[in-house]
Amino acid sequence: MSEASSKNLSETLFQNHKQAKETSSLTQYMPSSLELLDTRREQSSQAWYRNLRRLQWIWQGVDPVEQEEILARIASSKHSRTHDEWLDTVMGYRSGNWTYEWTRVGMLHQKQAAERQGEEAADQMFAAALYYSIAGYPHLRNDNLALQAQVLANNAYQEAAKLTGFVVKRLEFSYQNKKIAGYLHLRNTDSPKPVVLVSAGLDSLQTDMWRLFRDYLAKRDIAMLTIDMPSLGASSHWPLTEDSSCLHQAVLNQLADLPWVDHFRIGLIGFRFGGNAMARLAFLESDKVKACVSLGAPIHDIFTSPNKLAAMPKMYLDVLASRLGKNVVDVRSLSGQLMAWSLKVQGFMSGRRTKTPILALGLEGDPVSPYSDNQLVALFSQGGQAKKVKSKTISQGYEQSLDLAINWLEDELCK
């Protein structure tokens, strides 16, 4: 896509959204829940509605200096905010608005891609796709600005796929009379590759995973197939239920039809909620899956602790409500409903162990994925392991976790 056509597309997408509803105001709550959230916001020292994933975004390919410049522009904006306490709630598509600022820098990377050749151009275009995706974060279903940013992210990713020397194929898989869209990434097509099915979670898009392939899997000649979680991105037309692995299971059962991958050597990687889905799939399809890695996955504890769920930041509650298709949210009722999502409550961790070895990784002190959850996964997995990444090394936490995970996965897939 040329710089001019990119600019025209963005202007077309966003021109009617100067007064678009701001992300933090989209989810409607029952009066009692709203009172709880308002009180908590006023008493909190948290300055942002969104959970700022600075380290994760840097790992995924965001320039750390650019990131701080973007956040500084948002923080210093003089425009009206939905909530004065939260810096990232500037209303309308204008300077200081979250989507506006991330999209603007995404366009700069797209411009740089047009000025470069080969892999350098591809890297800039993949970066543009990542910035556009973060512009839509946390991807609430009725967030018009986020949906427009998602269009830009998908277009940029497809353009980047044409520029790179790696092979990136957009594939479709049949499920319930619809199509599941995913991207297959390969170092080359010389021979069928071991393949890793990847899920990025409930507030990240599959297009955020490029660096996982380029810097980790491609070097080991392992293919990567990405699929969005139900209710998100390319999978937005399926509701999210406690059957969290349904789409990935449907794709897994069609991998034998792909000539580029070795369907006898299939691995799984799931981040956050995607780890819940991947661990679940490792139990359901143990004959087909050789190894599974879950990173920071909620497995049991948070789903069976209503008070912990109710105390989560509003962004997380908004995301859960959005994925479940809730129009009006009662926090207590939502907490009760999510008990069914515990893999232990579903019966996976109370009987026979899965033959698939699972490596369950978590950050020390993580309330969403406590060490007890990872121990539970390892206990009911033959050859399973639970690992804790020390919080004092959080700046290297993503690199350390992934080095550990990918080396382990490679060993298991190539046995």
Curated annotation (Swiss-Prot):
It is an enzyme of class 3 (hydrolase). Signal peptide: none annotated. Keywords: Hydrolase, Serine esterase. The keyword Hydrolase applies. The keyword tRNA-binding does not apply. Its EC number is 3.1.1.1. It catalyses: a carboxylic ester + H2O = an alcohol + a carboxylate + H(+). GO terms for molecular function: carboxylesterase activity; hydrolase activity. Pfam families: FrsA-like (PF06500). Gene3D superfamilies: alpha/beta hydrolase. Catalyzes the hydrolysis of esters. Belongs to the FrsA family. This is Esterase FrsA. It comes from Vibrio cholerae serotype O1 (strain ATCC 39315 / El Tor Inaba N16961). The gene is frsA.
